[in-house]
């Protein structure tokens, strides 16, 4: 009987340990102090979620009064295709309480997220469109299906977009802003990427509708929580507008590995939005970056005009495709143009081709596989374990 009691106590202890949520990816130089993202377990109901938030608010208030903490508590809640999470500023005692709630799956630090762009080269040639519509290099003409993304909505999740730029006239609207109160593109990065995925002159999907979603400041940085909030808004908007299945989302940004970021983009993809993301510019394995490391999305590395891997581009088995990213000419705020380099420039090429495929009847679930299937195996020195396939729009040229 004593043995049975010991076993019972042991099993109870194991169950208690298993019930505790996991803390993902602690520490790092990019951590935002006292800022956390909390992800709930699958199956948690809206009522359970609200009850948890209420309990956290009470615990936070008690701990704040006890320790004189300046943390603000719960900030935003997210529900992306059934994936429930929230972010907030909490002290360590409150986080310990959250980790011990059996409805919580995991907690992670909120982190800084930055652009995936690099350099500017004035008066550089426009070559990306010609390259993705021909099997051989050196062609300047862009050949594309006349549907050109018509009927598809592309969400540019970035620094904002200059919605008055002639490249987007009649096809763009402002969506939301999760980073500040300035509904403009003070950086230019978001306008540039939008010009590539759907600009009239410089874009791949020239007839697609565009929505500006600002998650990064004029300085080019934001937070994981801010990016997730933007993605949450996109899914909600696409659902409300009946656009799921005919929507794409470009993420030319990234940061350190974040399970929450990866989960958010995966849920957006599963909801019916084709997601293209930049691999990153550290010349490292993209498996350590997010959202590039999310398996469900289409991760783009950067190529040069000579079909080489761009020197800065991340690589690795998680990369789905190479696309033009060095010295890409596109739109700039104020009606002008600008040349930028980075995997930020590769991703919108992929997003545009994906949007064009959606317009032709390819499903969101099949789009990235289709992109990889028709791509050309021409990239030289792609990196260890990395695909050598270069984006191609299937023009037949």
Swiss-Prot record:
Q: Where does the record place the Peptidase S8 domain? A: 126-397
Q: Where in the cell is it found?
A: Secreted
- What is this protein's name? Subtilisin-like protease 3
The family this protein is said to belong to: Belongs to the peptidase S8 family.
Organism for this UniProt entry? Arthroderma otae (strain ATCC MYA-4605 / CBS 113480)
Q: Name the domain of life.
A: Eukaryota
KW Signal (keyword) present: yes
**Start and end of every Inhibitor I9 domain?**
35-116
Q: Which GO terms describe its molecular function?
A: serine-type endopeptidase activity
Which PANTHER family would you find in this protein's record? CEREVISIN-RELATED, PEPTIDASE S8
Q: Any idea of its EC number?
A: 3.4.21.-
- Record's keyword annotation contains NADP: no
